[in-house]
Swiss-Prot record:
TM stretches of this protein: 48-68, 73-93, 127-147, 153-173, 184-204, 237-257, 278-298, 322-342, 379-399, 407-427, 458-478, 485-505
The keyword Magnesium belongs to this UniProt entry's keyword annotation: no
Taxonomic source organism: Emericella nidulans (strain FGSC A4 / ATCC 38163 / CBS 112.46 / NRRL 194 / M139) (Aspergillus nidulans)
Induction of expression: By L-proline.
Protein name: Proline-specific permease
Keyword line: Amino-acid transport, Membrane, Transmembrane, Transmembrane helix, Transport
Origin superkingdom: Eukaryota
Single GO MF annotation: amino acid transmembrane transporter activity
Cytoplasmic side: 1-47, 94-126, 174-183, 258-277, 343-378, 428-457, 506-550
Length: 550
């Protein structure tokens, strides 16, 4: 029996727009009405967009906190585990997005479409808020990184400059954003590759002092720094803490490809390509980077501990810089600080893009004011960009010490919010697979990834436990504070309030029936768009190498 058509599918179900979620067909209609986004992102831009958002201050600086608290072994182990989780999250998003890379698509749109409207609503605002706060976080980091050079003007001026540049790159044509992010990300990749090579040189004693490090610091002071309690229990808690904290380095990076799907050329060719190559780069940069950090800096290094305790965000708190200084290499710390600045600036650029497209998608679904669907003549949803960028002004809170405390709350909330959304992505993917199986279409997927659905079960299990235990340390004797408890768990209240409020108001079902999950609307349009898409063949060896990389 042949699968039902999109028309017959819609005739046999209740339109989801009655719940305020917005039918996929409505999404397309609203976007067309206000000038659609343009497919202006190339394959090379899409690939570096994702990895560029992933390589941020978490890798260059955030690793210092994990190293000092837990030791080099938990740092490496946690990055391996988190990279495997990101691989599966990226794969399931790649499958769903390649199947339906429609205009205005976003991760919460897919979640709501394949689960039920209230989950999509809560997820959507969780995503938008998190992206906007991450923008503010990276802008703040940029200002503090510049402070490393002790400029004669206030950090507030640098924050303003960074914000204005990010707005300019996002409010004009998407090609501007894509090209700027391509070069930003390229510089970050060169920086991390250079630091990894430098680490290998220091490992074998190639520095100015010719001190062969080897695995010295894994023996003294040791591979593990017991956390909270001594012995093996403390070592395990160190690993678990490292796993929780490493989430900030990876969070939301898989979603960037889905966010850009509606604006990329030849989506069914370029999205799978970006998905496959993204994870290779993550494994290379993050795992090798964490290994280099662990062998070149001791977890009890006084300079590193001082940088972490001072709350620095620039080169002074970077384990890479500490390793360079210990090796007696002069001047290179300024180069690394410039690389960290580019990293933070680029990540802020990516989060502004992701937040604006998420808000744009919410408005197209009827979940946000219609004004956010407005686009300019180049296809950029400028109202959504301005709304997301405005949240970035919270970065000025860091001009006061009390503001830094409040801002610390916001940035921690985004990490937990990201964990919650990864669990929801898993649920949406399982529902997507069941709907395809129901209609006998599972083998018709244009892009299939290995180890599914078992990889999704693995992600949901690990991330659920991480989410529930992310604030476990506050329950140890003498460590409980109301602020730390709220930082760890208030995101649950926010998410549940959004979810329950929408469900009570619209009386949505607990889950859309598998037989009614819409896997058809928009598919015919994408099939027509991609049916004549033929990949160009390289004309010479230079093109062959270039296309192999990008």
């Amino acid at each position: 029996m042949s699968p039902p058509s999109a028309k017959s599918m819609e005739e046999g179900r209740t339109p989801s727009v009655q719940y305020g979620y917005g039918d996929p067909k409505t999404l397309e209609g609203e976007i067309e009405e206000h000038t659609a986004t343009k497919r202006g992102l190339s394959s090379r831009q899409l690939q570096l967009l994702a990895i560029g958002g992933c390589i941020g201050t978490g890798l260059f600086v955030g690793t210092s906190t994990v190293l000092t608290q837990t030791g080099p072994a938990p740092l490496l182990m946690s990055y391996i585990v988190m990279a495997s989780i990101v691989w599966f999250v990226m794969n399931v998003l790649g499958e769903m997005t390649t199947y339906l890379p429609i205009r205005g698509v976003s991760v919460p749109y897919l979640i709501g479409r394949f689960t039920e409207p209230s989950i999509g609503f809560a997820s959507g605002y969780n995503y938008w808020y998190s992206f906007a706060m991450l923008l503010a976080s990276e802008v703040t980091a940029s200002g503090l990184i510049i402070e490393y050079w002790n400029p004669p003007v206030s950090v507030g001026l640098w924050i303003a400059i960074v914000l204005v540049v990010i707005l300019a790159l996002n409010v004009f044509a998407v090609e501007w954003y894509g090209e700027s992010e391509f070069w930003f990300a390229g510089l970050k990749i060169l920086a991390i590759i250079g630091l990894i090579i430098l680490g290998v040189v220091l490992f074998f004693g190639g520095g100015p002092n010719h001190d062969r490090l080897g695995f010295r610091y894994w023996q003294d002071p040791g591979a593990f720094n017991p956390y909270l309690v001594p012995g093996d229990t403390g070592k395990f808690l160190g690993f678990w803490t490292a796993l929780i904290k490493s989430g900030f380095s990876f969070i939301f990076s898989p979603e960037l490809i889905t966010t850009a799907a509606g604006e990329v050329e030849a989506p069914r060719r370029n999205i799978p390509k970006a998905t496959k190559r993204f994870i290779y780069r993550v494994f290379t940069f993050y795992i090798l980077g964490s290994l280099v950090i662990g062998v070149t800096v001791a977890y009890n290094d006084p300079t590193l501990e001082a940088g972490v305790e001072s709350g620095g965000s620039g080169a002074g708190a970077s384990p890479f810089v500490v390793a360079i200084q210990n090796a007696g290499i002069g001047g290179l710390n300024h180069v690394v600080n410039a690389a960290i600045l580019i990293s933070a600036w680029s990540s802020g650029n990516a989060w502004c893009y992701a937040g604006s497209r998420t808000l744009y998608s919410l408005a197209g679904e009827g979940q946000a004011p219609k004004i956010f669907t407005r686009t300019n003549r180049t296809g950029v949803p400028y109202v959504a960009v301005l709304a997301t960028w405005t949240i970035g002004l919270l970065s000025f809170l860091n001009l006061s010490s009390s503001g830094q405390t409040v801002f610390y709350w916001f940035t921690n909330i985004t990490t937990v919010g990201g964990f919650i959304n990864w669990v929801l992505i898993g649920i949406a993917y399982l529902r997507f697979r069941k709907a395809l199986q129901f209609h006998g279409m599972l083998d018709m997927l244009p892009f299939k990834t290995p180890l599914q659905p078992y990889g999704t079960y693995y992600v949901m299990f690990i991330i659920s436990i991480l989410t529930l235990t992310n604030g476990y340390a506050v329950f140890f004797p003498g460590r409980f504070t109301a602020s730390d408890f709220l930082v760890s768990y208030i995101v649950f209240a926010i998410f549940l309030a959004l979810y329950a409020g929408h469900k009570i108001w619209y009386r949505t079902p607990w889950l859309t029936k598998v037989s009614e999950v819409d896997i058809f609307t928009g598919k015919d349009e994408i099939d027509r768009l991609c049916e004549n898409d033929m990949e160009r063949q390289p004309r010479n060896w230079l093109e062959r190498v270039w296309w192999w990389i990008f």
